[in-house]
Regions:
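C-terminal substrate-recognition "lid" of short-chain dehydrogenase/reductases
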Residues: 86, 139, 219-248, 253
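Substrate-binding pocket helix/loop in short-chain dehydrogenase/reductase
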Residues: 103-104, 108-116, 211
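Alpha-helical segment proximal to the catalytic Tyr-Lys
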Residues: 132, 176-180, 239
């Protein structure tokens, strides 16, 4: 199989929550195979800086923008800017998300709703905004960053697990809706990676070791280990892959 199938020259990828963590890592990976980029987060300065750095490193076109994924008007503004400056969105990586760690009894309804709004409704908003342009082109990739915790439970994560499980079924549903339009829709389920969101666990030796003990490979994921999966799902190489989930968790959910 030719490695040209993994190249993305002439395509534009939008990564939500792309200014840091796995989002920034995936943005670099996609730029590394030729994709132009749209980086969005809630902070314009972080998004602009990330886009500038990646554009200079990989010699691609990119812009950064502030967008709250829970606000359709802000999401639609990003899509409109991408249409003007980069020819529209070809690849959407729904990565923005948060986690609030509290038990069901301790969880205020406002915290529950905030996680659901950002992790589940936000990606729906982005896909709804980006899909019409993909339909016009007859080609597109929508990728949801779910989690291994969308497949298995973990105490003190009720809205996070619910939202990430929702993304898996949202991907399956939209895969059926958009198949006739040349658009594939899939989900990635990462296990523990050393991201900003996981700092509380990284800084707690007992909690960290508890997680490691459940991973057959025996360690947390290294950031670059997400690269191959995102490139595959974003590229022509995955043209017959839709409505499915790829888990990157060191074997946690195999048990």
């Amino acid at each position: 199989m030719s490695l040209d199938l993994f190249k993305l020259h002439g395509k534009t990828a939008w990564i939500t929550g792309g200014a840091k963590g796995l989002g920034f890592q995936m943005a670099n990976a996609l730029a590394g195979v030729g994709a132009n980029l749209v980086i969005s987060s809630r902070h314009a300065d972080e998004s602009v800086a990330a886009a500038k750095q990646i554009a200079e490193t990989h010699k691609v076109r990119a812009f950064g923008a502030a967008a709250d994924v829970t606000k359709p008007a802000e999401v639609e503004a990003v899509v409109a800017q991408a249409e003007r400056e980069l020819g529209g969105i070809d690849i959407l990586v729904n990565n923005a998300g948060i986690n609030i760690r509290k038990s069901t009894i301790e969880m205020p309804l406002e915290d529950w709703q905030q996680v659901i709004d950002i992790n589940l409704t936000g990606p729906f908003n982005c896909s709804k905004a980006a899909a019409p342009g993909m339909i016009r082109k007859g080609w597109g990739r929508i990728i949801y960053m779910s989690s291994m915790l969308g497949q298995v439970g973990l105490a003190a994560r009720p809205p996070y697990t619910a939202s990430k499980a929702g993304l898996i079924l949202l991907a399956k549903t939209q895969a059926l809706e958009f198949a006739k339009n040349g658009i594939t829709v899939n989900a990635i389920c990462p296990g523990p990676f050393g991201t900003e969101m996981n700092k509380p666990l990284l800084q707690n030796p007992e909690a960290y070791q508890n997680f490691v003990s459940k991973i057959p490979i025996g360690r947390w994921g290294e950031m670059h280990e997400i690269d191959g999966v995102i490139i595959f799902l974003a590229s022509p190489a995955s043209s017959y892959v839709t409505g499915t989930t790829i888990t990157v968790d060191g074997g946690w959910t195999a048990q």
